[in-house]
Swiss-Prot record:
InterPro entries named among the record's database cross-references: FIB_ANG-like (IPR037579), Fibrinogen-like_C (IPR036056), Fibrinogen_a/b/g_C_1 (IPR014716), Fibrinogen_a/b/g_C_dom (IPR002181), Fibrinogen_a/b/g_coil_dom (IPR012290), Fibrinogen_aC (IPR021996), Fibrinogen_CS (IPR020837)
Region (Disordered): 270-307, 381-510
Annotated site residue numbers, Cleavage: 33-34
Organism: Gallus gallus
CDD domains for the chain: FReD
Protein name: Fibrinogen alpha chain
Positions of the Fibrinogen C-terminal domain: 498-739
Amino acid sequence: MIPVTILCVLLCLNLAWAQDGKTTFEKEGGGGRGPRILENMHESSCKYEKNWPICVDDDWGTKCPSCCRMQGIIDDTDQNYSQRIDNIRQQLADSQNKYKTSNRVIVETINILKPGLEGAQQLDENYGHVSTELRRRIVTLKQRVATQVNRIKALQNSIQEQVVEMKRLEVDIDIKIRACKGSCARSFDYQVDKEGYDNIQKHLTQASSIDMHPDFQTTTLSTLKMRPLKDSNVPEHFKLKPSPEMQAMSAFNNIKQMQVVLERPETDHVAEARGDSSPSHTGKLITSSHRRESPSLVDKTSSASSVHRCTRTVTKKVISGPDGPREEIVEKMVSSDGSDCSHLQGGREGSTYHFSGTGDFHKLDRLLPDLESFFTHDSVSTSSRHSIGSSTSSHVTGAGSSHLGTGGKDKFTDLGEEEEDDFGGLQPSGFAAGSASHSKTVLTSSSSSFNKGGSTFETKSLKTRETSEQLGGVQHDQSAEDTPDFKARSFRPAAMSTRRSYNGKDCDDIRQKHTSGAKSGIFKIKPEGSNKVLSVYCDQETTLGGWLLIQQRMDGSVNFNRTWQDYRRGFGSVDGKGQGELWLGNENIHLLTQNDTLLRVELEDWDGNAAYAEYIVQVGTEAEGYALTVSSYEGTAGDALVAGWLEEGSEYTSHAQMQFSTFDRDQDHWEESCAEVYGGGWWYNSCQAANLNGIYYPGGHYDPRYNVPYEIENGVVWIPFRASDYSLKVVRMKIRPLETL
């Protein structure tokens, strides 16, 4: 038993030694890892074996994959990549075919569009030439019309003179026939038809009163200018360049983009010189000098000059009635600035009075109260459109003498009337005594005739200019002779020009004082508290006249979803016939409604039904948010501004005392922005019962579900008149002063 055990131990030790040491086979390289050598019987089955075990270092000898398995894996991967490459090649081929197809379609499209684009370009050029030629012909026609109108006027004057001559001849014949009675062989009973001549004269007067100078004669035609649109200033390396194939197919190299500009020339206006500013369009400039001779006698005195003109307008109208033509005469007498000229009533016609002197300006109101506003230290220059001659006035104070610049003297040598009167010994009672001076004024008498439109214009002018530096204690009696007789007669067209260029404070002032104020149209006004002259549309045909258009919507051509500054300044425009869309501007509306003002809202739906609403309104300042004060509703449209929308509650929809809101300045009472949601600036509450500045929807009814981005009734609405989903066709807002009603 023991030997067997010893034998087993020795055998184990031998095996362990053999395991630790390398054999000769391994030393010769036979121990390297590699594919197992398989018998022929296993070659056919290795391709189909799928569940190969995982090979690790410990199991390399029994589980290592054979070369057959590795070759299969390589073949599968190669086949996969080959399929991918074939797929990519197929997609490239398809894209190339599509590219060729798209190029062919582009070429066909270009060939179709190119003739049309070239034809359109030619039409644009022809349109520019035709419009230029048309404008030239219109200007020629206007000149011919003006020539024909002058010929018609000359013929009217000739016919009138012939009628007068015929009447005179008939009267002479009647006198001779009457003188022949008793001494002639025959006698005739001849009577002059005086009534017939009077009717002819009235008809001629009525014909001459027709205005044959239409409005377009006084306006300058706009000029249509077409010029090529300049290319952008972007550098070339930032621009996308087409491929060489597409460059050959470019059809727009010869097509030029044209910019069409309609230039409207600015209308000339008469500038009024004030202070140290230089006058424009003037024929005479009157300046003043300030000197102090003696501090003890004439301290705080100065001399200034001003021109005050009063115009008397006599309008004759011939009205045909059942009893025959009858004549109406309307006489007005106002100054160019709208002040009272009643103190000049009863003056002698054909004279111009020049008053000169120095002293405290406030003392002049004893003689001429209206002149106080003219004698100010800040206003030392005035302008006049008359063509005036020149004269020199001499002034003597004490032992010295001085000569001041040129004054003005009207000369009418063709009338044969010219005289000079010396008023040096006169001193108005309003000046204090203390220093002596001598002044010389020129009184020029004139007479001429001017008739336009059947109306005769007579002018009375009060001109004051500096003729002495001091006016002191010249002793004279205090009788009525100290005040000269203010009488003048003038038919010069300058008076008419002054009236035509009159800038009123509102349309009601224009209606009363402007020559063409009785007609609706574009006029220039200067609101109280503003130095800016506005061009506004005045409606003189609606009840009482004097309505100033501040808002209008009629075709949706103007976007009313504007900023606060846009609504402050105003936007849009209307033509001379009142066509167009505009917002006059919150600042201008505030200036025009500082006093109680009547607001008239006119509405029209798409069926032609009209309604109106009138209120008494005031609009606050910008610091107050242009708050709307509104009351006293009258009309047929329903009270939307004060009462609001009764179904939603007046406290939420009334616009009274509300501030103006725009999408960039939210001043409403809603937690969100009403102006942003409803698409326009307005006096929102929470939010509205009326909004005349909303989105303009043609056709009337609209579905708010399709409104983007807010599905809400945001049209031009006046809910008491039409439903909230009905957008009105025409809306207008007009104002006029309440005090003139």
